[in-house]
A protein has these predicted regions:
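Short structured motifs
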Residues: 17-18, 93-96, 145-147
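Well-ordered beta-strand positions enriched in small/hydrophobic/aromatic, beta-favoring residues
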Residues: 1, 34-36, 54, 94, ...
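A short, sequence-level motif marking secondary-structure junctions
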Residues: 20-25, 50-53, 69-73, 125-128, ...
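Short, ordered beta-strand-loop transition motifs
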Residues: 25-30, 99-106, 153-154
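Flexible, processing/modification-adjacent segments and terminal tails
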Residues: 53-118, 126, 138-141, 185, ...
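N-terminal mature ectodomain segment of secretory-pathway/periplasmic proteins
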Residues: 1-61
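A structural detector for beta-sheet-dominated domains
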Residues: 2-4, 8, 25, 37, ...
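Gly/Pro-enriched, hydrophobic low-complexity segments
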Residues: 105-192
Length: 194
């Protein structure tokens, strides 16, 4: 997957980031190998989740990312669409939490709670059966990710545009440029040198 993100930094300024993401599927989300290379205007580094650990790579040197950066990266993994699509493999529980009309759209609410206690609410359109948004909480902050521009990529329906808010303030906007499934990914991308 290759795309662009607009991120709001600690100072409230928006930064444009190009990213490239590689994934090797595991038996569950916790066992997957995921690497995201991020290129900011002034720096380029990678965040990697492999062997149930998160670490960074900068100029081929391994580093421990800040706690907030690691948590944000892990939230993209564990509070994403895959949490619902792969709930059985993850050992998660599903609860149908109701049905409601919000701003003219009829939604089913599905709560997914994984083995680690992470809870994500999915808002599924009763008309299209697509996930239109998700909610989760982390450290007292309410996050909401909205999904837009669903299109097919190799027979898989993918939201090409997402917006993440924290306590109703936009902190991230992502636009996928290209996505490819089924390609061989070199395992060396996920080596941490230990």
């Amino acid at each position: 997957e290759h795309g662009k993100m607009s991120l709001v930094n600690d100072k409230g300024q928006t930064e444009q980031v190009s990213y490239q993401k590689w994934t090797i599927r595991g038996d569950s989300l916790a066992k997957e190998k995921i690497r995201v290379d991020e290129e900011y205007p002034s720096i380029r580094y990678a965040l990697v989740r492999a062997d149930e650990k998160t670490y960074g790579v900068y100029n081929q040197a391994v580093f421990s990312p800040r706690d907030d950066a690691a948590k944000e990266f892990e939230n993209r993994i564990f509070h994403g669409l895959e949490a619902l699509l792969r709930y059985k493999e993850n050992g998660s529980t599903l609860d149908l939490a109701g049905h409601e009309k919000i701003m003219g759209v009829d939604y089913y609410f599905i709560d997914v709670t994984d083995k680690s206690g992470r809870k994500t609410r999915f808002y599924v359109s009763s008309k299209t059966y697509r996930v239109m948004m998700i909610d989760y909480q982390e450290d007292g902050v309410k996050y909401r990710r909205k999904f837009y521009d669903y299109n097919y990529a190799q027979g898989t329906l993918v939201p090409y545009h997402t917006i993440l808010t924290a306590n109703d303030k936009q902190i991230e906007e992502t636009r996928i440029m290209t996505v490819t499934f089924g390609q061989k990914v070199d395992d060396e991308l996920f080596k941490n040198g230990s």
